[in-house]
Design a protein with these regions (language model features):
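STAS-typified acidic loop motif
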Residues: 23-35
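Conserved short strand/loop->alpha-helix "switch" segment adjacent to the catalytic nucleotide/phosphoryl-transfer site
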Residues: 38-62
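Conserved beta-strand-loop-beta-strand hairpin that lines the nucleotide-binding pocket
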Residues: 1-23, 69-165
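Conserved polar catalytic motif of the HATPase_c/GHKL fold
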Residues: 63, 67
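Heptad-repeat coiled-coil signal-transmission/dimerization helices
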Residues: 33-40, 123
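Structural signature of the histidine kinase catalytic ATP-binding subdomain
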Residues: 28, 49-52, 76
């Protein structure tokens, strides 16, 4: 519980723009992945998604964050990983960014080694569209998930203030 309290001070998740988007910056440490998933799940539950769609988004986003922490930031908690998600019309877009250079392009990313690289295949299979861009300034994974028109509706009141874990 103390770790969650410390994380909430360092990495406050933000639900903004009337609840149609989500943004969080987290320390690049593996122990923050579960809390990130919890916060993303909370935001997704406010959308009228089918359970399978929510599961796909959570799983793919979790894989992208794990890769950003392990590869982009080398699990260095002084580094950070940024996640932004937004609902626009009938698409949920999730963007995961880090400051490291661990992949050059989508094609390079989808060439697995014998023991690694399956998470990228998983992301490709779950997302309707996947792009991975590596630059000298970092790596960005962008995933688009097509959702039905009803997903444009939120349940409950929209949030406009940052929430703490």
């Amino acid at each position: 519980m103390a770790m969650l309290a410390a994380m909430s001070r360092e990495v406050p998740p933000v639900d903004r723009v009337g609840g149609s988007s989500f943004a969080v910056h987290l320390a690049a440490a593996p122990e923050h992945i579960a809390t990130f998933r919890h916060e993303l799940r909370h935001w997704l539950q406010g959308l009228t998604l089918k359970p399978a769609q929510m599961h796909d988004i959570l799983l793919a986003a979790g894989e992208a964050v794990t890769n950003a922490i392990e590869h982009g930031s080398r699990s260095d908690a002084t580094q950070s990983v940024s996640v932004e998600a937004a609902l626009h019309r009938e698409t949920v877009t999730v963007v995961v960014s880090d400051g490291g250079r661990w992949i050059e392009s989508t094609n390079a990313a989808l060439t697995p080694t014998q023991h690694r690289g399956r998470g990228l295949f998983l992301m490709e299979g779950l997302a309707d569209r996947l792009a991975i861009d590596g630059t000298d300034h970092g790596t960005r994974v962008t995933m688009h998930f097509d959702v039905p028109a009803a997903a444009g509706q939120r349940t409950g009141a929209p949030l406009s203030e940052p929430r703490e874990c």
